[in-house]
C-alpha cells in the first residue's frame, strides 16, 4: 500500500476517532487552536501524528528562513497536498523536532497577556457591535462573536452537507435537527478554540455535553463541514 493511501486512510480513521466522544473532539481542538494557520484536514493529520505540536513548518522554511535544523531521525508529519492535478504528500516538522543554529530564531507564538484583555474586549465590542450584556468579560464577548460568526455564515457552512450525509449517522436525522445541532456545535467549537488561543478556560461556560452531537459526524465526509467552520475563524 502506498504512503499516500496510508495517509488518506489515516485521515478517515482519525476523523472517526476525534468524533467518537466530546472529550476526543476537545482534544483535537486543543491541537487545532495552536495551528490556526492550517486548514482542517491538515490540523486533523497533525493531531493524528503529533498531537502536542505547537508550530509546524516545512524543512525548507525551518532551514532557510528560521535557521533551525531538523533533528536527525525526526519524522515528518505527512499532509495531503491537493493543490495540483494529482494529490501528493508534503511534510512538515514541529518546532520540537528542530534545533537552532547560528543566526537562528524561533517563530513568534502569540500569547495573550493579562493587561491585553481589556483592549481586546474593547476591540471585539466595536468590531462586532456587541451588546453591553455580552461584554461583561472576554469569555462572554468571545461567545457572542462565535454566535455571530456562525449566524452570518451558516448557509455557507451547511452548503452540500445533505449530500455528504449518506452512510453517516446524520442520514437518519431530519433537516431541522441537523441544522440546529450543527449551529450549536459550530458555535461552541469556535468559542472553544478562541478561548484556547487566548489562554482562557472554555469549560467555564461550556460542558462536555455541549459537544454530545459530535458523534453524529462520524465520517470525514461530514466532519469536514464542521471542521472547516471551526478552522476558518
Q: In which residue ranges do the predicted regions lie?
A:
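N-terminal accessory/interface modules of nucleic-acid-binding and processing proteins
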Residues: 1-233
